[in-house]
């Protein structure tokens, strides 16, 4: 399987985003099979983590918008990153199953809880890119926290600017995640880069458009300051669970994007349907 090398077709942006939003609703039963056991296992873990960090998060959110808030913003980013690492095995497993369902109609079993080689490779790729983006974008803040030397605002701005082109590159390469999920080792990073040429902004803004609605329930974090520890922990846990389910929209976008640039051959789909379980 290889992409069109002459002139890559432009991704139909809004149609793809709309289809990505429709997928979880259209296949809600399958989504339930993919997620319910993982969510059940992760809920107590998330609740424990949220209980531990709730006082710190509440304090940070209370300082947002103040001068003190500028110095603690990196702490909120770090806490978010740590939670992402904890969630990564579950999220990667769910994403791989969802990719395979959308593209090759592979039906997950009702007690889906799988971590195989594809899931590990998927999670590793996400982890590496996240560490690089997070490290470069917040390098001045992390270095200041480690050394006690406060960096000027222009240095923080430069770090953010440097992270932007890297973010665009990561977006262009993102369909490789789908190839990993499908176990298609014949698709290389070079193939993905060539196939997505002239689609950089679509690849970058597509996932953003698919997760932007998650900011609506996230607004409740600004009210954590008035909650007790248990309530704050419950809210943080609920937001994490919503983000996992809502993130499936972004996974759907990647699947549809991959199908656009790398059309699936009929015999591949048929093999997936009749393959023994």
Regions picked out by a protein language model, each given a short descriptive name:
Residues 2-3, 56, 60-77, 86-90, ...:
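Juxtamembrane transition segments at transmembrane-helix termini in multipass membrane proteins
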Residues 76-84, 109-138, 155-163:
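Alpha-helical membrane-spanning segments of integral membrane proteins, especially the hydrophobic core
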Residues 48-65, 134-147, 220-226:
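Membrane-helix interface motif
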């Amino acid at each position: 399987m290889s992409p069109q090398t002459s002139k890559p077709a432009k991704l139909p942006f809004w149609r793809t985003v709309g289809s990505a939003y429709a997928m979880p609703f259209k296949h809600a039963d399958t989504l339930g099979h993919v997620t319910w056991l993982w969510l059940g296992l992760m809920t107590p873990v998330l609740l424990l983590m949220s209980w531990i960090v709730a006082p710190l998060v509440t304090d940070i959110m209370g300082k947002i918008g103040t001068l003190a808030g500028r110095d603690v913003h990196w702490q909120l980013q770090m806490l978010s990153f740590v939670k992402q690492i904890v969630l990564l095995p579950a999220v990667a497993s769910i994403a791989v199953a969802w990719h395979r369902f959308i593209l090759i109609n592979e039906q997950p079993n009702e007690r889906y809880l799988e971590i195989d080689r594809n899931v590990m490779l998927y999670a590793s790729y996400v982890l590496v890119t996240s560490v690089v983006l997070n490290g470069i974008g917040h390098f001045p803040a992390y270095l200041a926290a480690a050394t006690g030397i406060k960096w000027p605002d222009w240095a923080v701005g430069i770090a953010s600017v440097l992270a932007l082109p890297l973010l665009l590159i990561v977006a262009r390469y993102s369909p490789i995640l789908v190839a990993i999920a499908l176990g298609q080792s014949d698709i290389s990073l070079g193939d993905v880069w060539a196939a997505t040429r002239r689609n950089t902004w679509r690849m970058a803004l597509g996932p953003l458009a698919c997760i932007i609605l998650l900011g609506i329930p996230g607004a409740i974090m600004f009210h954590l300051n008035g909650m007790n520890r248990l309530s704050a922990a419950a809210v943080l846990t609920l937001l994490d669970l919503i983000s996992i389910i809502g993130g499936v929209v972004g996974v759907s976008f990647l699947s549809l994007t991959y199908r656009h640039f790398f059309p699936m051959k009929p015999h591949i789909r048929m093999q997936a349907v009749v393959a023994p379980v």
